[in-house]
A protein has these predicted regions:
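ATPase nucleotide-binding head domains, primarily ABC-like/P-loop NTPase cores
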Residues: 1-152
Length: 152
C-alpha cells in the first residue's frame, strides 16, 4: 500500500480500487465525441461494479457534453444506479439540482462544497470543505468584473 501524508488527526480507510472519470477527451481520429467518450468510461465503471469489484469512484461534472435537461435526467439515473450498486465515491458538480438528491436519499448522500467569498470586491477562497451546497455565484461575479456582463 502507498503511503501519503494526511492532514487530519485521524483517518480510517477501506482499501478499494480508485476509479476516476476526470479528464475525458474527444478524438477526431476515432470519430468519438467528448460525450460518447465519457459514456464509454461510465459504462466501464458500471460494468466493473456489476462484476462485484469494490471501487471508490471520483467523477467530475458528469454528462457535461449534453444539454442541461438531458444531463440532469441522466445524472440522476446514474447516481441512483451507483447507489443501488452500493458504490462509494465523490461526484464533483456545479449542477445545483443534482445537489437536491440529498432530499431523496438523506442517509446515502452528503453535499460538501468549497465556498468562494466576495470580500472588498475580490474573490477569496478559504479552501475549507464546508457542508452543503455552495451559495455564492462567483462565475457571474467574475464575468461582471471582467466586463462580460453589462446588466445585472
Amino acid at each position: 500500500m502507498y503511503r501519503l501524508p494526511v492532514c487530519c488527526s485521524s483517518l480510517e480507510i477501506y482499501p478499494a480500487k480508485l476509479v476516476t472519470s476526470l479528464r475525458t477527451s474527444d478524438s477526431l481520429t476515432d470519430n468519438e465525441s467528448y460525450f460518447f467518450a465519457e459514456l464509454k468510461r461510465l459504462k466501464q465503471i458500471i460494468d466493473r461494479l456489476n462484476k462485484g469489484e469494490e471501487l471508490f469512484i471520483i467523477l467530475d461534472e458528469i454528462l457535461k457534453g449534453t444539454n442541461s435537461m438531458d444531463k440532469q435526467k441522466g445524472s440522476f439515473a446514474l447516481v441512483r444506479q451507483l447507489m443501488e450498486l452500493k458504490t462509494n465515491g465523490i461526484i464533483a458538480t456545479h449542477d445545483l439540482l443534482l445537489g437536491k438528491l440529498i432530499e431523496y436519499f438523506p442517509k446515502e448522500i452528503r453535499n460538501y462544497c468549497f465556498e468562494a467569498d466576495i470580500t472588498n470586491d475580490e474573490l477569496t477562497f478559504s479552501y475549507k470543505l464546508r457542508e452543503g451546497i455552495a451559495q455564492n455565484m462567483n462565475a457571474c461575479f467574475l464575468m461582471k468584473k471582467m466586463g462580460l456582463i453589462i446588466n445585472d
